[in-house]
Amino acid sequence: MRLTRYFLPILKETPKEAEIASHRLMLRAGMLRQEAAGIYAWLPLGFRVLKKIERIVREEQNRAGAIELLMPTLQLADLWRESGRYDAYGPEMLRIADRHKRELLYGPTNEEMITEIFRSYVKSYRNLPLNLYHIQWKFRDEQRPRFGVMRGREFLMKDAYSFDLDEAAARLSYNKMFVAYLRTFARMGLKAIPMRAETGPIGGDLSHEFIVLAETGESGVFCNKDVLDLPVPGEDVDYDSDLTPIIKQWTELYAATEDVHDAARYETEVPAEKRVNTRGIEVGQIFYFGTKYSDSMKALVVGPDGVEKPVHSGSYGVGVSRLVGAIIEACHDENGIKWPEAVAPFTVAILNLKQGASDTDAACEKLYRALTANGVDVLYDDTDQRPGGKFATADLIGIPWQILIGPKGLAEGKVEIKCRADGSRELMSPEDALARFGAKA
């Protein structure tokens, strides 16, 4: 993509309403625009990151055996009355009515609707286990939306829902999602720690929040620092095998949110030098809630003994849009964002340091065409901005690799590659630069 043809509304000044780094940088980098309190338009650069994150989430859900569908944003109020949550959910739920006075709501979550879909089609244990997921926009009418996408009113979520014959089988489904979440966040360059958590309005008696440690987080957390060094399962993980050893490794060390923190146990189990008491950002949460919804909504299947019984369920959420902010909170410096390569809007930025000069124009054009032809996401800064301005823009928007092309280097047959993550620089030939990114001239 040529920057002269791209829509990238960079802000020179930091908006006054931005309180934390991710909000400031997303606004300054032209990633989003606030349209109302807690409601944002995703501009092209931000939308590219959102789609990269969504792709990783989808790949790991599919790998774990979940099946994608898509449910509507609007739901019937009567479904929520069946479960008993319509009145209990509170003012965060946006309640609306259509022209026929039918009561609807803008879904903050989807347990009722997925249970209604399940009970309409699945009648036998032979169709279990089943895990269905979707990625959809949601709305919660937060009393005080703040911190940009970290606590917005409209947000993109991945929700998965598992259905099993009994608790033992449901725990296996829970374990699969536990491992899938470890892999999902690791692929995005995040260290997300699973921590025991409260179940809240979802219900049930088992839940883990996946927390990225950050001083700007809204959750108080307590853990053994050894949990920060645990290995994440690799691509070869077999979801049909016994995942208990992995789960045990991650859950036997103390890690809990402040809502369920046990101070006595913490002091007993965790040596003083290994205690971590900080704040964190919740990027995902998983729940096992048994028959909470299948009981009230009559989601029954016939078991092997011929007797009908309510299914056991769990739900598994990932805050897709919140992850954009969480990654920035974990990956930035005073100059801007430092995107992990897997979620970066572009992999490479080509900076023409003397736009209009025939030699630099030709070299940039050749590299740009070769890289894009080989499937590399490239942003080519072909503007007439001064070099200092180009450096500032590239650092602000956080492209992982910058290729700097100027007349002095070209005279020696060299271009310069800068790594945004650590600031390191290296001179090499244009051909070697192409090879660095798996491309050929």
Curated annotation (Swiss-Prot):
Keywords: Aminoacyl-tRNA synthetase, ATP-binding, Cytoplasm, Ligase, Nucleotide-binding, Protein biosynthesis. Its main location: cytoplasm. It holds the Pfam family HGTP_anticodon. GO terms for biological process: prolyl-tRNA aminoacylation. One of its GO terms (cellular component) is cytosol. The keyword NADP does not apply. PROSITE patterns: AA_TRNA_LIGASE_II. It catalyses: tRNA(Pro) + L-proline + ATP = L-prolyl-tRNA(Pro) + AMP + diphosphate. It is an enzyme of class 6 (ligase). The keyword Ribosomal protein does not apply. GO terms for molecular function: ATP binding; proline-tRNA ligase activity. It is found in: Cytoplasm. Its EC number is 6.1.1.15. Homodimer. Belongs to the class-II aminoacyl-tRNA synthetase family. ProS type 2 subfamily. Catalyzes the attachment of proline to tRNA(Pro) in a two-step reaction: proline is first activated by ATP to form Pro-AMP and then transferred to the acceptor end of tRNA(Pro). This is Proline--tRNA ligase. It comes from Afipia carboxidovorans (strain ATCC 49405 / DSM 1227 / KCTC 32145 / OM5).
